[in-house]
């Protein structure tokens, strides 16, 4: 039975197209794509099945982008690696696997592998060989080739702070300034989508539409309890405000204690 109380974002990406690019051994039928459709009922979410060979996958994606002219592309893991190279469109790379060859071998994904989701072509198994790994290594050498100031504005990176598989935050940050850590692992679960991905999508949608939200400033001292721990109401209040306002936190910035600023940023 459908959950009538599930929060959605009917005012987000209205009439726009989003391409979702799945990860390794996944498919367009992934639950992640359906979550995005549920959250943004006024948007069209396109989620293709990718060929296992990276050159074929990249060709499919480029043709799809040319045909559909999406307003936003979201890619996770392997899909995040492909997404980075789809220049000219606003993009979000979630836990992008920019070192796919090493990721496959280090994560014991060689040999016979089973797709995690149903593919339209009916294929459910594949043999991952050394030759295929080399194809991925060759593909990742093309990442970051066309980064310029405009692309840096278009691209966001989201990185789980407990991701045991992909560790590319520093590599991404060498090329793109909009890199964000979130509380989560490698797999993009619904909690991470709701709390971390949706606010970035909202920011991109606002920018595309030229919307200026009113600003709310919150003193950091109001966020903590008597023991310096975040108040239990903090997260919920922040998300409620974020639906309608640009929210900023105000913290002291002592010039003689530069480390204090980093500590406060980490706490928030």
Regions found by a protein language model. Give the residues of each.
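Short, acidic loop-to-helix structural element flanking the phosphoryl-transfer center
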Residues: 225-249
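Active-site catalytic motif of lipid deacylating hydrolases and related acyltransferases
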Residues: 12-67
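Gly/Ala-rich beta-loop-alpha elbow adjacent to hydrolase catalytic centers
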Residues: 74-84
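Asp-based phosphoryl-transfer active-site loop
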Residues: 210-227
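Substrate-recognition "cap/lid" segment bordering the active-site pocket of phosphatases
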Residues: 250-268
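Aromatic pocket-lining residues of Rossmann-like dinucleotide-binding sites
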Residues: 86-87, 241
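The alpha/beta-hydrolase serine catalytic core
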Residues: 90-199
């Amino acid at each position: 039975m459908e959950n009538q109380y599930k929060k959605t974002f009917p005012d987000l990406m209205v009439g726009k197209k989003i391409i979702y690019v799945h990860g390794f051994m996944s498919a367009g039928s992934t639950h992640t794509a359906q979550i995005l459709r549920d959250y943004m009922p006024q948007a069209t979410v396109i989620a293709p099945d990718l060929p296992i060979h990276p050159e074929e996958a990249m060709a499919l994606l480029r043709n799809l982008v040319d045909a559909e002219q999406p307003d936003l592309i979201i890619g996770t893991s392997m899909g995040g690696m492909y997404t980075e190279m789809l220049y000219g469109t606003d993009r979000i790379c979630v836990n992008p696997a920019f070192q796919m060859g090493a990721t496959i071998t280090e994560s014991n994904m060689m040999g016979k592998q089973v797709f995690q989701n149903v593919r339209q072509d009916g294929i459910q198994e594949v043999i991952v060989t050394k030759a295929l790994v080399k194809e991925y290594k060759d593909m990742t050498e093309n990442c970051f080739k066309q980064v310029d100031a405009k692309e840096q504005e278009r691209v966001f990176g989201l990185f789980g702070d407990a991701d045991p598989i992909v560790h590319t935050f520093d590599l991404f940050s060498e090329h793109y300034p909009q890199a964000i850590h979130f509380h989560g692992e490698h797999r993009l679960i619904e909690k991470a989508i709701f709390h971390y991905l949706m606010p970035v999508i909202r920011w991109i949608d606002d920018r595309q539409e030229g919307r200026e939200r009113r600003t709310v400033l919150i003193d950091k001292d109001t966020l903590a309890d008597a023991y310096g721990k975040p108040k239990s109401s903090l997260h919920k209040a922040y998300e409620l405000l974020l639906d309608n306002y640009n929210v900023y936190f105000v913290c002291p910035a002592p010039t003689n204690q530069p480390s204090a600023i980093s500590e406060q940023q980490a706490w928030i």
